Amino acid sequence: MELVVKSVSPETLKTATLVVAVGEGRKLGAAARQVDELSGGAISAVLKRGDLAGKVGQSLLLHSLPNLKAERVLLVGVGKDEELGDRPFRKIVAGILNTLKGLGGSDAVLALDEIIVKNRDSYGKTRLLAETLVDGEYTFDQFKSQKAEPRALKKITLLTIKAAQAEVQRAVNHATAIANGMAFTRNLGNLPPNICHPTFLGEQAKNLGKEFKDLKVEVLDEKKIKSLGMGSFYAVGQGSAQPPRLIVMQYNGGKKSEKPYALVGKGITFDTGGISLKPGAGMDEMKYDMGGAASVFGTLRAVLELKLPINLVCILACAENMPSGTASRPGDIVTTMSGQTVEILNTDAEGRLVLCDALTYSERFKPQAVIDIATLTGACVVALGAHTSGLLGNNDELIEQLLSAGKAADDRAWQLPLFDEYQEQLDSPFADIANIGGPKAGTITAACFLSRFTKNLNWAHLDIAGTAWTSGGKDKGATGRPVPLLTQYLLDRAKA
């Protein structure tokens, strides 16, 4: 679907549907007043009958109003002035899109520029609107024998004032790239694990490198992983017929003298728990355990599409965690790339085992900041639910930048503590560190484990176990998060 930005009066455009706002108390927005005057008070007459109160979520479709080039006018309730938050605004936009899809028209014009969203300027409001529209077009029916019919809606025009047109266009460009990145992430996450395995993800990286010539891609196989001394990473994949892969993608859009930013993604393409086997109920959703790697793919795609003037390295630690005669066992001790030894007390705490070696590997790029992204702990879902990603790290400035980016992108994170006292839970009598820290503070102790491998890095950890996918029901599937947060962080660094 194409998004177009124009600065014209709404009545001048020929369109299948013109969308205008009505506030609570039947207050007409600026565009609605123009349409009302041209149509001889047609909207006012409808509102006087009580057909629409202007509350959030209400809408009313009018046909063939006089003196208009639009075939239909869709009145949309937007609530009280200056009380509209991000979530209600997104719901309004999603409702508009669903209505437009059902009408069958090929285009629509949205005259909603006068809507006030709390703490949002013209750019921020348009970002939310455009991202919701493009992301709302997402479908995943690759494996359905009967595909959904192609949608008639091909173009939506966003109207704004002349003075804001450049800023609104910038917001649309950013939102479109982010939504495209989210779609890439969602597609990878929704694929079945018999197709989306570590080798497949390596192929996707190479395909991305072919599409974007300024991307350098290297895929390291199991022999290279072993030769690098990544004993922890290698141990996770050794029980599977699908060999592990370390995927390294480098984009150099900034100056050669500038240190890169690094994104490190957990890519467990299916997690049975290994010998520490998970319960069978809901295990199908463990295909989403590569959500961290998928979100790095999506963020990188957005960066490439926007050609951001930054240097970025993306490292994906991809493996399949399976039980077998060759799988690692509880009690095994492995040596990491850093030289530290780890006692594997639970093979289902495997994400940290692949990430620790990937984080050590990232040091060779001398990054100015490293962010790892992982569906790491069920404890994070208990603590924060499905709305907020967990955030921990060793650099206060980096943490604040990520919190700010999450707020700006409406893709929030929340900081959890990383106090030294928690480190004691990882003590092992036989190795330098144990891979689990007991039942308490599971999200924190998982990050404590990773912190042992990031002492030379400005590092942050995003636990997206609750936000990477939606469980069960008709809305089941990958969400595309935290692509908006990560892309916003990089936009801020690029000052784009």
UniProtKB/Swiss-Prot annotation:
Cofactor binding mode and count: Binds 2 manganese ions per subunit.
Record: active site: 278, 352
Cofactor requirement: Mn(2+)
Family annotation (PROSITE patterns): CYTOSOL_AP
Cytoplasm keyword on record: yes
EC number: 3.4.11.1, 3.4.11.10
Entry keyword annotation includes Transferase: no
Residue runs in coiled coils: none
InterPro entries according to UniProt: Leucine_aapep/pepB, Macro_dom-like, Peptidase_M17_C, Peptidase_M17_leu_NH2_pept, Peptidase_M17_N
UniProt superkingdom: Bacteria
Signal peptide limits: none
Residue numbers binding Mn(2+) 1: 271, 348, 350
Primary location recorded for the protein, binned into one broad class: cytoplasm
Residues engaged in binding Mn(2+) 2: 266, 271, 289, 350
GO terms for cellular component: cytoplasm
GO biological process, one term: proteolysis
Keywords: Aminopeptidase, Cytoplasm, Hydrolase, Manganese, Metal-binding, Protease
Compartment(s) where it occurs, according to its Swiss-Prot or TrEMBL record: Cytoplasm
Gene Ontology molecular function, alphabetical: manganese ion binding; metalloaminopeptidase activity
Reactions performed catalytically: Release of an N-terminal amino acid, Xaa-|-Yaa-, in which Xaa is preferably Leu, but may be other amino acids including Pro although not Arg or Lys, and Yaa may be Pro. Amino acid amides and methyl esters are also readily hydrolyzed, but rates on arylamides are exceedingly low; Release of an N-terminal amino acid, preferentially leucine, but not glutamic or aspartic acids
Entries under PANTHER family matching the protein: CYTOSOL AMINOPEPTIDASE, LEUCINE AMINOPEPTIDASE-RELATED
Family listed: Belongs to the peptidase M17 family.
Role played: Presumably involved in the processing and regular turnover of intracellular proteins. Catalyzes the removal of unsubstituted N-terminal amino acids from various peptides.
Record-linked HAMAP family: Cytosol_peptidase_M17 (MF_00181)
Record's protein name: Probable cytosol aminopeptidase
Annotated source species: Pseudomonas fluorescens (strain Pf0-1)
Designated gene of the protein: pepA
